[in-house]
Amino acid sequence: MKSYFMQPLRGTKDILPNEINYWHHIHDKALTILSLHNYSEIRTPIIESTSLFKRSIGETSDIINKEMYTFTDQGDRSITLRPEATASIARAFISNKLYHSNIQRLWYLGPMFRYERPQSGRQRQFHQLGIECIGSINPMADTEVIHLANQLLKELQVKNYILEINSIGTLEERQSYKLDLVEYLSQYQQDLDQDSKNRMYSNPLRILDSKNLKTQEILDGAPKLKKYLNKRSTEHFYLVCTYLNNLNITYKINYKLVRGLDYYNQTAFEIKTNSKNSQNTICGGGRYDTLIEQLGGPKTPAVGWAIGIERLLKIIEDKLILPKQKINVYIATQGLAAQKKIWEIIQALEKKNIKFELDLSNTSFHKQIKKAGKLGAKFCIILGDQEIMDNCVTIKRLDEYVQYTAQYSNFLQEIHKLQH
């Protein structure tokens, strides 16, 4: 009988040592690029009050209605594992009074949780890398964050992706548009797919990104959101596009693009690969100028994005050739006296930052040296009863098949040579 409790939960995955180098690579590239633009890393708790997400993401969203991991704790509080990070960062901005400083440029990388049907590129525990530029209404901020996403993807060798961008205007502009959109769609209600019917009166804007071909045909004749934007919204979007042109960033204006979270306004964007996989959106973001005020903070404009790490890895894993993690030194010992003395050598290796592995098998020297070769070590330090008697150390250079003996005190003085 299969031991289900010994398997990871459905929609979760162990990240094994042979995979973790890719994660480190992404983190290091993000740190380098974002630090250059003065973005600082922030880490928020993975659990938050459920009300935070209900107030920010929107009561009618799929995340709130179907996907949140929510439980009541021992203090009878409703707690949720974060389904996304922007709301948590907005909460941190308020609770830590970060609004007393100038513009906050923040970035994060961590796990998120949504109860979704697991499939390729979609898990119930997944990871996002994201940035938030908080405190500026300037369209240059929108352009900066998009530019950083573009820079990071280029550095990670992502090819053949397209930036889609739109303006979804202000809340007031969208309200006017929603009324006319619902009026138009109600004429074709019987022909809409079931998801779109369900969204008609709760979240009609989400119908715009329906994957159903019949629904998309109906939408071709629907009112266009861009005609409802006022002069200020139109000018903001025009400047974002102008700055992207200045940066030679290719983009496509997609007037049907809307984001699935209620807090977005003005600029909305997604970066998609040319994969036929339905999960081909690897980055999504936009402006959220009312969220912080809505959560009880001061009126504060902001813009940001998030990249799905698992989706990103599916694209770059085969293209990235990362250096194998090898050790310089393998330490082979036999006998209690040698195993007492070896700790002085270990401390000397540590002081010189020489990467090593201590054999813990108590097997023969032959087997220990064979293990050193398999690990790709350059040197094998051998310390046994004979070496203890002669007050020396045997060093085997594995890549040159050379072995020599050194007096113990001389060896410690010249241990730095094992770095090469």
From Swiss-Prot:
UniProt catalytic activity: tRNA(His) + L-histidine + ATP = L-histidyl-tRNA(His) + AMP + diphosphate + H(+)
CC per GO annotation: chloroplast
Gene Ontology MF annotations: ATP binding; histidine-tRNA ligase activity
This protein's UniProt keywords: Aminoacyl-tRNA synthetase, ATP-binding, Chloroplast, Ligase, Nucleotide-binding, Plastid, Protein biosynthesis
Record localization: Plastid, Chloroplast
Keyword Chloroplast carried by entry: yes
Any Pfam family hit: HGTP_anticodon
Matching SUPFAM superfamilies: Class II aaRS ABD-related, Class II aaRS and biotin synthetases
Chief localization: plastid
Keyword DNA-binding on entry: no
GO BP field: histidyl-tRNA aminoacylation
EC number: 6.1.1.21
EC primary class: ligase
UniProt cross-references to HAMAP family, sorted A to Z: His_tRNA_synth
Family from the record: Belongs to the class-II aminoacyl-tRNA synthetase family.
Name listed for the protein in its UniProt record: Histidine--tRNA ligase, chloroplastic
